[in-house]
Structure formats: C-alpha cells, structure tokens
C-alpha cells in the first residue's frame, strides 16, 4: 500500500508535464508465461532477443513481477483517467502472449505520446533505487521524440526518488 501512495505522489507531480490531450500508454512488463522465441531488438537490427522474458519474483512477497506490474499499471490507469487523461493499456490481464515488438506496435497504433513500461527488476539483496530508460539520440526511429522523452524520463526519476527516498 505504501508503494501505491508513493505512486500517487509521483503521478501528481509529473502529470503537470503533459497536457490532458495526450494519450498515455501503460505497458505492465512481462506476462504470466514468457515467450522465448526471438525477434529483432529494433527495426533493421540483426540482434535478437526473446519476445518476452519471464521476469523476476519479489524477495519478501514472492509475487511475480508480471503480477505486480499489472496491479500497479491498473491503479496508475485509474489515477490518470481520474485526472482526465486518455489511457491505453497494453494488457489488462496476465494471460496474454504479446511480444516486445507487438507492444511497441500497439502503442504506436493507439497514438500514444507517452509510453510507460512498468518493471520491478531484480538485483542483489542490497540493491535499492529506480531506473528510467529512454531512447538514444542516435536512434533514427525515435530521434524526433528523443529530447522530450529524455526530459520526461528525468522528471519521472526525480519525482520518484523524492517520493520514495531511493
């Protein structure tokens, strides 16, 4: 419950960076069953990786990452909708088979201007903190949105660390 309270604080701070006209995509990471078939990691790339990895599990709670990500994603969806935002959910159930590439295509097709992919990554027992990833300025497929993505990502990380103390 503390996490959800902190998420609400974060949300209140960061939503000022977006207009209510923008559509937000929430992609709760992973799913009940991984898909170890491979796909390219980006358009035109020769590098491949599994379509969807299995994810991790909480050390204390034993809760699977895919389940936690969906629970948080649904609460975030409801909070954003209550503030007037249009929200697209990549998944609303754990029993899906959606590859990483398919998730990106779904988001683009939905016309989302903000893409939030939720994960609870694993680390050593002393690991604490948060990670925010954004596209590279060198990526030709995301060059037009890279600066705004970077600014938004940094704001999320800043507000998250203020709200959680990490």
Language-model features: where?
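Catalytic-site microenvironment of enzymes
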Residues: 2-166
């Amino acid at each position: 419950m503390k996490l959800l309270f902190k998420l609400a604080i974060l949300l209140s701070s960061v939503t000022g960076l977006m207009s209510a006209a923008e559509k937000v995509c929430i992609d709760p990471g992973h799913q009940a069953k991984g898909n170890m078939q491979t796909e390219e990691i980006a358009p035109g790339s020769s590098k491949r990786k599994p379509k969807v990895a299995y994810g991790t599990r909480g050390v204390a709670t034993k809760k699977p990452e895919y389940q936690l990500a969906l629970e948080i994603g649904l609460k975030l969806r409801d909070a954003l909708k209550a503030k007037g935002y249009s929200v697209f959910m990549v998944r609303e159930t754990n029993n899906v088979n959606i590859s990483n590439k398919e998730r990106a295509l779904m988001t683009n097709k939905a016309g989302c201007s903000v893409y939030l992919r939720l994960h609870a990554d694993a680390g050593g027992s002393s690991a604490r903190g948060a990670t925010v990833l954004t596209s590279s300025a060198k990526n030709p497929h995301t060059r037009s949105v890279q600066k705004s993505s970077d600014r938004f990502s940094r704001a999320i990380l800043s507000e998250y660390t203020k709200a959680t103390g990490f």
